[in-house]
Amino acid sequence: MLVIEDVRAYEVLDSRGNPTVKAEVTLSDGSVGAAIVPSGASTGSKEALELRDNDERFGGKGVLKAVANVNETIADEILGLDAFNQTQLDDTLRELDGTNNYSNLGANATLGVSMATARAAAAALGMPLYRYLGGANASILPVPMCNIINGGAHANNNVDFQEFMIMPFGFTSFKEALRSVCEIYAILKKELANSGHSTALGDEGGFAPNLANNTEPIDLLMTCIKKAGYENRVKIALDVASTEFFKDGKYHMEGKAFSSEALIERYVELCAKYPICSIEDGLAENDFEGWIKLTEKLGNKIQLVGDDLFVTNEDILREGIIKKMANAVLIKPNQIGTITQTMRTVRLAQRNNYKCVMSHRSGESEDAFIADFAVALNTGQIKTGALARGERTAKYNRLLEIEFESDEYLGEKL
């Protein structure tokens, strides 16, 4: 048995220049695992707590408290634990914190240790991370949801919807699917430049132009897909992030106030006009009646993803399944705080025929853990931004590496 011999953490920077936690775990055989924790901008109110210092450093965004919690409180408790018993480790972290949202230790502290331990254990066995976490059944390369036009909280522009994505279904390999996205992305840049729009990038590497409304980005994507020659092989996905513009019971966008019913009808119209295959957070996280109506209306036609609605929380997802809200769940490990809790949520979803989408955060790093994690859990889909910015391409490049060992791409089977 190999045990955890040393744990340490320190501040590093995420892709927005904000501090985040990097954790390193050393095992008794000398194997080392490290992990960098991401951070979100558009966050659900029920997410696990990201502990910040709230002092003068970095405008209050320092994470020295979380770092100290790893180096002192957590290290004292987990030294000597079996490195291969991830469940025991993660349950220990949860019990040590003593809350249901990691408000004492910080989910950025616990997740860093959880991820780093998994990496160290995989290294000790000489196994790739996806194989260690997923076993022999980890074999499916996910279909990417590539966010190539950014709006909402991820960009400084006038577009309400947060992400306009393309999904390459009609391909037999991940590398060919990714190639199609690269070509569409390049054409989009030219289209924007030629029409006098900004080609500045948002947080997730997508372009962030000012556009007339929330339909114009979709028209742009359709034009680029056609010019690239990928009609009927690439579809559209949206992350509306509607909680961000929900106030006083109405959805405020494009200078108007929409009721839940009116916004649902807007989605119905969009789905009739465009090849939209997925809508994420189409309604606000607490608009439960609206979610039920949305699912009744579109749930048998397209994928309806709950992000803020479910926050990767097994108990909240279970309640949503019972109430028939959405038919898919976004998976963000830092919303829940440990690898084990993330895996439990994925398994609950899969048992109930809810699809899963592994996801990055808008504040990311070069850490490509979620690429392995998506393959390990056979989520079938991954969101990790545009084909730009190193923290985004790190995940795509890791998936290309994995494809050499495991070449089943879900594509048309999804």
From Swiss-Prot:
- Positions binding Mg(2+) in this chain are D239, E280, D307
Q: Which GO terms describe its molecular function?
A: magnesium ion binding; phosphopyruvate hydratase activity
UniProt cross-references to SMART domains, sorted A to Z:
Enolase_C (SM01192), Enolase_N (SM01193)
Example GO CC term: the record gives: phosphopyruvate hydratase complex
Q: Give the co-factor note.
A: Binds a second Mg(2+) ion via substrate during catalysis.
Q: Which reaction does it catalyse?
A: (2R)-2-phosphoglycerate = phosphoenolpyruvate + H2O
Q: GO:BP terms for this protein?
A: glycolytic process
Q: Does the keyword Transmembrane helix apply?
A: no
Enumerate the subcellular locations listed in this protein's record, separating them with semicolons. Cytoplasm; Secreted; Cell surface
- Entry binding sites for (2R)-2-phosphoglycerate: Q162, K332, R361, S362, K383
Which CDD domains does the entry mention? enolase
**Pathway note:** Carbohydrate degradation; glycolysis; pyruvate from D-glyceraldehyde 3-phosphate: step 4/5
Kindly state which keywords UniProt assigns to this record, in alphabetical order: Cytoplasm, Glycolysis, Lyase, Magnesium, Metal-binding, Secreted
Q: Where on the tree of life does the source sit, at the highest rank?
A: Bacteria
Which residues catalyse the reaction? E204, K332
Give the EC number(s) listed in the UniProt record. 4.2.1.11
Q: Which InterPro entries match?
A: Enolase, Enolase-like_C_sf, Enolase-like_N, Enolase_C, Enolase_CS, Enolase_N
Tell whether Secreted is among the UniProt keywords: yes
Q: Which cofactor does it need?
A: Mg(2+)
Pfam families associated with the record? Enolase_C (PF00113), Enolase_N (PF03952)
Q: Which PANTHER family match?
A: ENOLASE
- Family stated for the protein in its record: Belongs to the enolase family.
Role of this protein = Catalyzes the reversible conversion of 2-phosphoglycerate (2-PG) into phosphoenolpyruvate (PEP). It is essential for the degradation of carbohydrates via glycolysis.
Q: Fetch the HAMAP family from UniProt.
A: Enolase
Question: What name is this protein filed under?
Answer: Enolase
